[in-house]
Amino acid sequence: MESQAADYNPASRNLHGSSGEMKLRRRKSRQYVSAQEKRSPRRGLLGENTYLVLFTIALRILNCFLVQTSFVPDEYWQSLEVAHRMVFSYGYLTWEWTERLRGYTYPLIFASIYKVLHLLGKDSVQFLIWIPRLGQALLSAVADIRLYSLLKQLENQEVAQWVFLCQLCSWFTWYCCTRTLTNTMETSLTALALFYYPLEGSRSVNSVKYSLLVALACVVRPTALIPWVPLLFRHFYQEQRKLHLTLHHFLPVGFITFSLSLIIDRIFFGQWTLVQLNFLKFNVLQNLGTFYGSHPWHWYLSQGFPVVLGTHLPFFIHGCFLAPRRLHILLLTVLWTLLVYSMLGHKEFRFIYPVLPFCMVFCGYSLAHLKTWRKAALSFLLLSNVPLAFYTGLVHQRGTLDVMNHIQKVCPRGPDPASASVFIMMPCHSTPYYSHVHCPLSMRFLQCPPDLTGKTQYLDEADMFYLNPLRWLQQEFHSNASLPTHLVTFNVLEKEINTFLTSGNYERAATFFHTHWPERRTGSHIHVYERRLPGRVNTGGN
C-alpha cells in the first residue's frame, strides 16, 4: 500500500509530451509553487505549521501546571511511587505488584527520568513531581497534532480545525491528558497509532508503526487492545496480502515488544511472568475488580459516556449522522469499547478515555456543517468546558496533594530520621506517598488489599477502622510510645476521634480544602494534627 502511494506521481502522465510543452508547464509550476509558498504557513515540526505545533505544546504545558488536583490513586501508586522505589530504594508497592498484575515497563519511563535527575543532583521533590507530568503533556500535544494532521488528510483543513478545536476544549481531556496514568499514556498511543492506521484517504499509512504503538499501549495497559479489536480485524479483512501482514508486521512487532516487556519484568520481579495475562485474568476473566465497586450494565451509557463527553455529546450524535461512511469504523470502535466495558462490573470514567479522540472526530464534523449556528455552538462549548476544566483542575479534590506539600516540611533535617512519623487515616491511597515527599520519613496509611481467597465477609484494614474509628485507634495505639507525631484525616472524623486526639496531646497544625462535594468517608477539608511534645517546635500550617 505504501509503495504504491510512493510510486504514484501525477506528473508522469505528461512524460510523452513535447519538450516545449514540458518547459512551459515546468515554468508555470515553479511560479505556482512560489506563490503557494508565500501564502502557506511555515512548516517544520511534525510536518505541520510550526506556530500551530508550538501553540499546542505551550497549551499542554500550561494545562499541566493548571491541573493541581487528584483524580484516582493509580496516577501515583502505579507509576511515580513504583519509579521512586526503583531508583531511590524506598517507596511502597501495592498488592498488585505482589500479585504481579502490573508490569515495570511503564514505571521504568519515570524511573529513567528520576535516575537522570539523581545523577545531575537535581532530584528535588518538585522536579520529581512535575517533570514526569511535563513529559506526558508533551506526548499529549503530539497526539493532538497527529489527530489534526490525520483529519486534514481524510477531509480538509476546515474539518481538521474543528476536530482539533473540539479536542483542545474538551474538559475531560484537559483534566486527564497531563496525568501520569496508564490510561493517559494509552490514549496518547492510541491517537498516535490511528495516524498510521490504513483509513481510506490517509497518506500516512504505516502498518509497522501503528502496530508498534498498539503493542506498546497493550504493554502499558493490556485492556488497550479492546478499542483496537474492530480496527485490527478490519485491516486484516481488507488486506489482500494477509499472510505478509501477519508474518512481517503483526507477529514481529508483537514478539519484540512483549519480549522486551517480559525481560524488563524478569529483571525487576526476579522471575519470569507475563503480567499482561495476569492483568486480563484478574480484571476481565475473573472480574475481581468489583472489589473496588460495581455498577449496573448501563452505567457507561447513562452516566460514564455522557460525563466524559460533556457538552460535546449533542455534537457527537449530530456528527455520527454526517460523517462519511469510511469513518463508520471509528464509531463502531467507540460502540464496541462501550459494550465490552459495560459487561465488566467495575467501571470508571477513565477506562473509556482512549476513545474520546475518536468522538472528537464526529464532534468536529458536526461543527463544520453548522454554518448558521457555528459561532453559537462554539461559544456554548467554550463556556461550558473551560470553567469545568478549571474547576476540576484547580479546585475539586486538591487537598490530598496540598497536604503532601505540608508533610514535606515534616521530613527530618537532622541526624535522627526517626524523630517524626505520619499516619494517614483516610480511605486507602487517598494521597500520593514517597514520590511526593522524597525523604525516608516513617509513614503509614490504612491498607485495603482485596481478598483473593474467596471469603464472604472480608473486611480490610480501612473497613475495620471506619466501623469504629475511636476504638480502633485506642486498640492500635495502646501506649503513648507508639503514637505517631502527625495524623492526617478528613474533617468528617474529627468528632468521632476527638477523645483520642485530646488524650494523645494532638493539636490541629494545618487545614486544607479538598472538595465542595464530600461523601461518606471523604470530607470537605483535610486536617493535620501534630502531637505536642516537650521541647519540640510544631511545624504549624495554614
UniProtKB/Swiss-Prot annotation:
Pathway field: Glycolipid biosynthesis; glycosylphosphatidylinositol-anchor biosynthesis
Keywords: Endoplasmic reticulum, Glycoprotein, Glycosyltransferase, GPI-anchor biosynthesis, Membrane, Transferase, Transmembrane, Transmembrane helix
Annotated glycosylation sites: 480
Highest taxon listed in the record's lineage: Eukaryota
Cellular component GO terms, alphabetical: endoplasmic reticulum membrane
One GO BP annotation of this record: GPI anchor biosynthetic process
Region of interest called Disordered, as start-end residue ranges on this chain: 1-36
Pfam assignment, any one: Glyco_transf_22
Subcellular localization: Endoplasmic reticulum membrane
Entries under InterPro entries matching the protein: GPI_mannosylTrfase
Top-level EC class as recorded in UniProt: transferase
Membrane topology field: Multi-pass membrane protein
The protein's Enzyme Commission number: 2.4.1.-
One of the record's GO molecular function terms: alpha-1,2-mannosyltransferase activity
Transmembrane segments: 52-72, 125-145, 213-233, 244-264, 304-324, 327-347, 351-371, 376-396
The family this protein is said to belong to: Belongs to the glycosyltransferase 22 family. PIGB subfamily.
Function: Alpha-1,2-mannosyltransferase that catalyzes the transfer of the third mannose, via an alpha-1,2 bond, from a dolichol-phosphate-mannose (Dol-P-Man) to an alpha-D-Man-(1->6)-2-PEtn-alpha-D-Man-(1->4)-alpha-D-GlcN-(1->6)-(1-radyl,2-acyl-sn-glycero-3-phospho)-2-acyl-inositol intermediate to generate an alpha-D-Man-(1->2)-alpha-D-Man-(1->6)-2-PEtn-alpha-D-Man-(1->4)-alpha-D-GlcN-(1->6)-(1-radyl,2-acyl-sn-glycero-3-phospho)-2-acyl-inositol (also termed H6) and participates in the nineth step of the glycosylphosphatidylinositol-anchor biosynthesis.
Protein name stated in the entry: GPI alpha-1,2-mannosyltransferase 3
Organism annotation: Mus musculus (Mouse)
